Regions:
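Transmembrane-helix signature of polytopic, membrane-embedded enzymes
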Residues: 20-22, 81, 230-233, 252-272
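Transmembrane-helix motifs of polytopic, lipid-linked glycan transferases
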Residues: 67, 237-261
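Membrane-interface alpha helices of multi-pass inner-membrane proteins
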Residues: 276, 307-323, 327-334
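Membrane-lumen/periplasm interface segments of multi-pass, membrane-embedded glycan/lipid transferases
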Residues: 363-451
Length: 560
């Protein structure tokens, strides 16, 4: 064969990747234009004075970057690396789509993390922060949507009829038919212009938060941000990004450690709620990562010393971050058969030592917080004087049937918490699309785990199911005892993020059932490939929707 003919045969292999990139990026750019036009028309951005070129540029740029990332990840063959890349990239979008202080308790977490980044490893209620921190906290109250919600009676300008209004759940409010739109952008303007105003913000001091260890990643990010000359807002995003790196690293370790049902793990890690917490200043970022890592280790056929060590470290850390309820994780390695246990220590001794380490860290953290605490005085119980843990526990023990009714009623009122996977903010920012689609996406992930090689066995799956039920009831009971007024008929303070490891176990259980019912022919490798595509794009859509609901629309019109 001549050299000319060889060159002709090789041309398609050179041109095909370039053509694929050009086609995909063109489609993505077109979709970006469509989304920007939809935002401009449906949410009236032009009438609100928002630059059309800016909106179009943002949408097109983001869509093109997403397409480029998807094409680049096609070259990555390792599932764990590909999954970690999706978690990191989508997590960055969540870090910036989520306005400051809007993750539950993020104000306290921000203040504690900022203090640690300044080298403060003790706790002083009278110690303040730089003035720009005061301004940031004043500009962005926690539960921003609830703080800017109003209800009452107004007059419709078209029909002149009185009608009630309630702007709960809407981050953007328009006062009058053609009036000004109030949004969280006003808070950014308030913070960014604080140097030019005469008013002095209320001074903030260190919060009632006495943890150090889980806030170290965020503190490192804040220290780096200050090193580059960034202010309070830059420190917030710097802390979020390094916290996201910690979450990504733990998820990567979990994906590498999981020997079965890896699509289920990737799906729960890329759930918008998981990324929302992982890309915040909350200690849930590392806590969720530890949960996923421990469950991933339990998919291994055999345990050696290294596996046992990683599980013990994750379990001890989880207990140091959220004590007592996480002691339940100590018993999970006992579900392994004796033939599967290749660790030098016996299972019973290992469980006792892990429990001892968890309790030691828990008590050490409590003593550290007590001894290095200054000027706090008597700390009031959360929930007020009507909350009494001992009395509530006694009430539960005396009225077990009534408490079962309380559990069931709370689950019913909150859509089983599975239907609240799209409830963001301080439970004040509902995104209906995510709440509706998250359960089907989890079911799809279960279907991708139906390969025969992904089976965990009846014994292990059965005990994991029991653990999931006990953990869910335990989490609800803990909130009933510590946060809920004595005898109340519903449980106060529960959020769907507490149940994310339970939803992972539910997906594993659904996969076991579907494997028997459907007799699928899907291979594990094909399931993993489909999982990256499905869950990656779903996470991307979740970040875009979170940004849309906080900054673009829908807009609630209030008629006075």
């Amino acid at each position: 064969m001549s050299n000319v003919s060889k060159k002709k045969l090789s041309l398609p292999t050179v041109q095909q990747p370039a053509a694929r990139w050009a086609f995909v990026l063109t489609v993505c750019a077109s979709l970006g234009v469509v989304v920007s036009y939809y935002w401009r028309v449906f949410y009236g951005l032009d009438a609100r004075g928002v630059s059309a070129a800016g909106v179009t540029g943002l949408c097109v740029g983001l869509a093109v970057l997403a397409g480029a990332a998807a094409l680049a990840l096609r070259r990555v063959r390792d599932f764990a690396k590909k999954g970690a890349a999706c978690i990191l990239l989508c997590g960055v979008l969540f870090a910036f789509a989520n306005p400051p202080m809007q993750t539950p308790d993020e104000t306290d977490h921000y203040l504690r993390t900022y203090a640690i980044s300044m080298g403060r490893f003790d706790f002083d209620a009278q110690r303040g922060y730089p003035e720009d921190v005061d301004e940031l906290v004043a500009a962005f109250p926690g539960a921003w949507v609830n703080a800017h919600t109003s209800a009452g009676l107004g007059t419709d300008p078209d029909t002149h009829a009185e009608q009630p209004f309630n702007s709960a759940g809407y981050a953007l409010k328009q006062y009058g038919k053609d009036g000004r739109v109030e949004s969280i952008r006003d808070s950014f303007e308030q913070y960014l212009t604080w140097l030019y105003r005469d008013s002095v913000p209320q001074r903030v001091t260190e919060p009632v938060s006495f943890l150090i260890l889980p806030f170290l990643p965020g503190a490192l990010g804040m220290a780096l941000a200050r090193l580059f000359g960034l202010g309070a807002l830059g420190c917030l995003y710097g802390g979020r990004l390094v916290n996201l790196l910690a979450y990504t690293a733990l998820c990567y370790a979990a994906l590498r450690s999981a020997h079965k049902c890896r699509p289920a793990f990737l799906c729960i890690m890329l759930m918008p709620m998981s990324l929302y917490m992982g890309a915040s200043l909350s200690y849930d970022a590392t806590l969720l990562g530890c949960y996923y890592l421990m469950l991933a280790l339990l998919t291994r056929d055999e345990w050696d010393d290294k596996t046992a060590l990683f599980y013990a470290l994750a379990c001890v850390f989880a207990n140091g971050t959220k004590p007592y309820i996480n002691l339940l994780w100590v018993v999970l390695p006992l579900i392994l058969r004796k033939s599967e246990w290749k660790v030098r220590l016996s299972r019973a001794v290992y469980a006792v030592l892990t429990a001892a380490g968890a309790l030691a860290l828990t008590l050490g953290v409590e003593q550290y917080g007590t001894l290095l605490r200054h000027n706090y005085g008597a700390i009031a119980r959360q929930g007020g004087t009507t909350v009494n843990g001992g009395a509530q526990l006694l009430f539960v023990l005396k009225n077990p049937l009534r408490y079962i009714a309380v559990l069931l009623g709370t689950l019913y009122e909150n859509d089983g918490f599975l239907g609240q996977l799209g409830l963001f903010g301080w439970k004040d920012m509902p995104i209906a699309f995510i709440s509706i689609t998250a359960p089907p996406v989890l079911l799809a992930a279960a279907m991708l785990c139906t390969a025969q090689t992904d089976t965990l066995g009846r014994r292990r799956m059965g005990w994991l199911g029991v653990f999931g039920l006990v953990y869910a009831v335990g989490a609800m009971t803990a909130m009933y005892i510590t946060y809920t007024p004595v005898g109340m008929v519903r449980i106060v303070g529960l959020q769907t993020r507490y149940f994310l490891p339970v939803w992972l176990l539910l997906v594993l259980a659904a996969a076991a059932v579907l494997r028997r019912v459907l007799a699928p022919r899907l291979t594990a490798a094909k399931g993993e490939t489909l999982a990256v595509t499905l869950c990656g794009w779903y996470a991307f859509a979740g970040a875009v929707l979170l940004f849309q609901h906080y900054f673009v629309g829908p807009v609630y019109t209030i008629y006075k």
